[in-house]
Amino acid sequence: MATFESSLKPKLIYVFRINDAAHSGALKIGEATAELGDGYFTPNSPLLKQAAHQRIDQYTKTAGISYQLLYTEGTMFKDAKGCISSFNDKQVHLVLERSGVKKKDFGKKNQGTEWFMTDLPTVKRAIVAVQEGRQPPIGREISPKQETIVFRP
């Protein structure tokens, strides 16, 4: 009897930093695949951390770059209607950008596009905003700066 193996693998979001001058104040928000599990993970579970380390090591280990993994979270969740949903790192990036969080400028075109000048609590709030289906900008939750509204006649 033939067996079926799904090609769909659970995804996760990871956040890490590199403690050097070039990356000062910046966090990388990326996405990886978890090879095990059903997709429902608690944030920072050992399985998520392992998958994140495997992914990050792919592009840091050979260069001898040390990093600090700060946070991991599975991308599958139940939405407000109880339906299974998923999100990706690009959606988190969009919330951050539209909320006024700046990307890290490394001085080269198309380099470091997933690095943001932010802190971990802000990234976590952006993830929640994506899960709740809130459209950016999410204002005061992300940035303490309040823009003036100009009404047109």
For each of these PLM feature ranges, what is it?
Residues 1-153:
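Non-catalytic accessory segments flanking enzymatic or RNA/DNA-binding domains
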